[in-house]
Amino acid sequence: MATTESFAQTLAAKQPRLLAAFKHIIAQNHLAHAYLFAGMEGAGQPELAHWIAQRLFCLHINDGEPDGTCEECVRIANGSHPDIVTVAPEGQRIHVDQVRYLKAEFSKSAVEGNRKLFIINDAEKMTASAANSLLKFI
């Protein structure tokens, strides 16, 4: 997993306007309950999702940026934060069992803080039954 600096650097290079928009959205406390990031592979969608996670959980925000060195940022970068739930395709698809896992996690309280964040990588690879299951609870 990448570091906070590389998340921000990647986003600044690939999606500078989007990064600026999300900095503003978060600073104004206008973050919606869900976002769908679509685009060509390599456009920075996973980096943006992880940057948002670090920005929301970071213990030491500096000029609107996560510091990348606090325990929260490091665990997010390593994929080990208990309040960040990530689902990705198993093989070529995201299956209904993975969405059931998300639903079960969604119903639980945050482990360490007052919020949880869910990231679905490559959501377009959901089976039809997985997508229908997801739509029933979001």
Residue ranges of predicted features:
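Clamp-loader machinery-focused feature within the broader ASCE/P-loop NTPase space
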Residues: A2-K136
